[in-house]
Amino acid sequence: MKVTCVLGSPRANGNTAAVAQRFCNAAEKLGASVQIFVLNTLNYKGCQGCMACKTKMDKCVLQDDLTEVLESVREGDVLVMATPIYLWDVTSRLRAFIERTYSYFVPDFHTNPHPSRLSPGKKLVFIQTQGQANESLFADIFSRIEPIFKRYGFTDNHLLRVCGVRKPGDAESRGEAMRLAEETAQKVMAPTKGK
């Protein structure tokens, strides 16, 4: 199983990265091939609204550092998106990545019963960390993003949320957060029925 992990945090060694790394390490131990992309180290733009992916090509026409990431998702089985909450939402780097996934839709995706260019049955793990300990805050983030990926054909989707982590190291000191990351990896790596 091929896992593409997209880290949306500007802090390469922060809480978001720690939880994502724990998930990826557990998945590797279970046989996954893992590729990690730190978005903050890449040079790319968000969607330019040019519509070339609907009129000229079946991929995004922008050629930048995100090209490899988009192709890895296309070829992979599992997408891990990890983000801290910045100003009540995902980071701008992750948002720009999500915008660029628009190229996964076929031109007539509004009416086509098969709207995605991706192979169906991919799995999504959404890792959300936040400084706020109140779990009712920012609880809507995943519910806004998941429908996009369901339209792309992702069918086994998981939310891994860690609240109340501000300083680097906070997540690692919380055993339940690290256990949840490992347990989620076990669920994701479990054989899918019928395969």
List the predicted regions and their residue ranges.
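N-terminal beta1-alpha1-beta2 submodule of the flavodoxin-like/Rossmannoid cofactor-binding fold
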Residues: 1-106, 111, 167-195
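Hydrophobic anchor at the start of a short beta-strand
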Residues: 34, 156-157
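Short, glycine-/small-residue-rich phosphate/pyrophosphate-handling segment
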Residues: 110-152
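Short, solvent-exposed amphipathic alpha-helices that sit
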Residues: 15-27, 140-153
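Cofactor-binding loop segments of dinucleotide-utilizing enzymes, especially the Rossmann-like FAD-
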Residues: 8-9, 39, 128-131, 162
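Beta-strand-loop-alpha "switch" segments that mediate conformational coupling across diverse proteins
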Residues: 157-164
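Short, well-ordered coil/turn elements that cap or connect secondary structure elements
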Residues: 29-31, 55, 119, 151-154
